[in-house]
């Protein structure tokens, strides 16, 4: 599951439908990607990061890896 993305989406009060529309995909398709059943395409990750004005790694890298990378 994309926990960082889910948390960010909820903090910014966006729905799955909002992000599906942003990516020009179905809400069900987006939901499956957020659940980790399908992978986000590279361009979709960049679109989402740009939309939220966040670093792509902060959204899509696993939290453990992101923390380890910051301390290096």
List each model region and its residues.
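Short, charged recognition helix plus adjacent turn
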Residues: 8-13, 50, 58-72
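Short basic helix-loop element that most often maps to the first helix and adjoining turn
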Residues: 3-22
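Basic Lys/Arg-rich amphipathic helical interaction modules
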Residues: 1-3, 72
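Short, basic-rich loop-to-helix N-cap that marks the start of a DNA-contacting helix
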Residues: 37-47
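DNA major-groove recognition helix of helix-turn-helix
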Residues: 34, 44, 52
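Recognition helix of helix-turn-helix/homeodomain-like DNA-binding domains
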Residues: 25-39
């Amino acid at each position: 599951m994309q926990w960082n993305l889910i948390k960010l989406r909820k903090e910014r009060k966006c729905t799955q439908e909002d992000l599906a529309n942003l990516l020009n995909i179905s809400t069900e398709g987006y939901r499956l990607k957020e659940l980790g059943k399908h992978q986000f395409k590279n361009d979709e990750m960049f679109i989402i990061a740009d939309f939220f004005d966040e670093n792509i790694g902060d959204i899509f890298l696993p939290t453990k890896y992101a923390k380890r990378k910051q301390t290096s």
